[in-house]
Swiss-Prot record:
Gene disruption: observed consequences: Mutant is deficient in sucrose transport.
Annotated organism of origin: Staphylococcus xylosus
Reactions the enzyme catalyzes: N(pros)-phospho-L-histidyl-[protein](out) + sucrose = sucrose 6(G)-phosphate(in) + L-histidyl-[protein]
Protein name, as recorded: PTS system sucrose-specific EIIBC component
Record's keyword annotation contains Cell membrane: yes
Lineage of producing organism: Bacteria, Bacillati, Bacillota, Bacilli, Bacillales
GO cellular component, one term: plasma membrane
Subcellular location(s) of the protein: Cell membrane
Primary location recorded for the protein, binned into one broad class: membrane
Length: 480
């Protein structure tokens, strides 16, 4: 492959050197900030053998090339343009300028929660393993594994502690990540999180039970002002708002406190004032809002049943195209942290249905495509990848390009999601939203069985609808 020629052709299709403001690359994609995306020649890019697909998200225009090749093409781009590679964070910052306020808000949530996902995934998957060990009826009739094989009980207890830690101490993770994102000191953010989950406080999990039972809530009395001594274990919204206040106060103090006293007074005053504000006003208010949000979404999912699942499943892929799905991470984290009352997250199973359907549609396109060997090759690899939870190549490289597979995919996603919602399948962990996602699913009410059946439904419907649409005259000769 002539990488120099490929780079020249890509640059020309992007609108020329003057249209590129910043550029970098990841493992598989060129990531660019363009002055005017309207100048991009999508057809020319699609005709290039080296390009597997393109899409625009988060203020960035991304060109899918593939592992092992993208770095070589990018190296030639650097030589041609004379521009050095920007860091990924610099490209993200530059791309943010092209976003509207809502897109910036979604990106903010993504920036905060994506770094802590590994901890949430680890805790959630360990929770799944613990459920396998402790749930009755999996290995023995009406009995759990640890009831029959008592030697596993110690292991189950240990895993249960490991699993609960990331959720119970979630404010510490959020505090660190959010403070960093808001321009404050990340360690002060973590310290604030530690304060909100201090063991001397009444646990956030015990607080609703105490209210329901009419028990007295412990409180501080500050000059006649009673402040509840209640923790914020597993809480998302209170910690987000509190950390924003902390970072704002910290940055303000650093502007007015003399340098010689900065390291002494700024942390002291920032933590003291934010802690007081949080326990007095912000915490109780945002805790209530958080309960309303998670309870409201859970009620909609359970009340809406199959119809609600159908609508969400139909809309999920279009939401992904806009990038708004990143905002779901915060909601999912709260739903899973409150799984004792919510039962877990309904978003993960529906995301899986969308991914499976995108993969099925891409595989259907593989069998339909006759002339375009390049697209046929992309469809086969992308289809398998989507079944395993990675949908970008399938969605942007095949299904949206041909249009009718995307229609088939959203129909399959809708039907599969309707089944999921009807049987109230939920996830107790974040993980890979695809075939490997079984371990993230709650085993209650035959959740694993219904999850598997729903994936089969989504696959068959998406594959079948895509194949049927290919015979329609308006789509018959489309091989972009």
């Amino acid at each position: 492959m002539n990488y120099k020629k490929s780079a020249e052709n890509i640059l020309q299709a992007l609108g020329g050197e003057d249209n590129v403001e910043a550029m970098t690359h990841c493992a598989t994609r060129l990531r660019l900030v363009l002055k005017d995306e309207g100048l991009v020649d999508e057809k020319a890019l699609g005709d290039m053998d080296v390009v597997k697909g393109t899409f625009s998200t988060g203020g960035q225009y991304q060109v899918i090339i593939g592992s092992g090749t993208v770095n070589k093409v990018f190296s030639e781009l650097e030589k041609i343009t004379g521009k050095e590679a920007s860091s990924v964070s610099e490209v993200k910052t530059q791309g943010t300028k092209n976003m509207n306020p809502f897109q910036r808000f979604v990106k903010m949530l993504s920036d905060i929660f994506v770094p802590i996902i590994p901890a949430i995934v680890a805790g959630g998957l360990l929770m799944g393993i613990n459920n396998i060990l402790t749930a009755p009826g999996i290995f023995y009739d009406n009995q759990s594994l640890i009831e029959v094989q008592n030697q596993f009980s110690g292991l189950a207890e240990m895993i249960n502690i490991f699993a609960n830690a990331p959720f119970t101490l979630l404010p510490i993770l959020i505090g660190f990540s959010a403070a960093k994102r808001f321009g404050g000191n990340a360690y002060l953010g973590a310290a604030l999180g530690m304060i909100l989950v201090h063991p001397e406080l009444m646990s956030a999990y015990d607080y609703p039970k105490a209210l329901e039972a009419g028990k007295e809530i412990p409180h501080w009395n500050l000059f006649g002002l009673e402040i509840n001594q209640v923790g914020y274990q597993g809480q998302v919204l209170p910690m987000l708002v509190a950390t924003y206040i902390l970072a704002t106060i910290e940055k303000g103090l650093r502007k007015v406190i003399p340098t010689v006293l900065d390291n002494l007074l700024t942390p002291l005053l920032a933590i003291l004032s934010t802690g007081f504000i949080t326990f007095s006003f912000v915490g109780p208010l945002t805790r209530t809002l958080g309960y309303w949000l998670s309870d409201g979404l859970t009620w909609l999912y359970e009340f809406g049943g199959a119809i609600g699942g159908l609508i969400f499943g139909l809309l999920y892929a279009p939401i992904v195209i806009t990038g708004m799905h990143h905002s779901f991470i915060a909601i999912e984290t709260q739903l899973i942290a409150d799984s004792s009352s919510t039962g877990g997250s309904f978003i993960f199973p529906i995301a899986t249905m969308s991914n499976i359907a995108q993969g099925a549609a891409a595989l259907a396109a593989f069998f339909i495509i006759k002339e375009n060997k390049k697209l046929k090759g992309v469809a086969s690899a992308a289809g398998v990848s989507a079944l395993l939870g990675i949908t970008e190549p399938a969605m942007f490289g095949v299904n949206l390009k041909l249009r009718y597979p995307f229609i088939g995919a959203i129909v399959g996603s809708g039907i599969g999601s309707a089944y999921i919602a009807f049987f109230k399948v939920k996830a107790i962990a974040l993980g890979t939203a695809g075939i490997p996602g079984f371990i993230s699913i709650s085993g209650q009410n035959n959740g694993w069985l219904h999850y598997g059946i729903a994936m089969i439904i989504a696959f068959i419907v998406a594959f079948g609808v895509t194949y049927a649409l290919s015979y329609r005259k308006k789509y018959r000769n489309i091989e972009a």
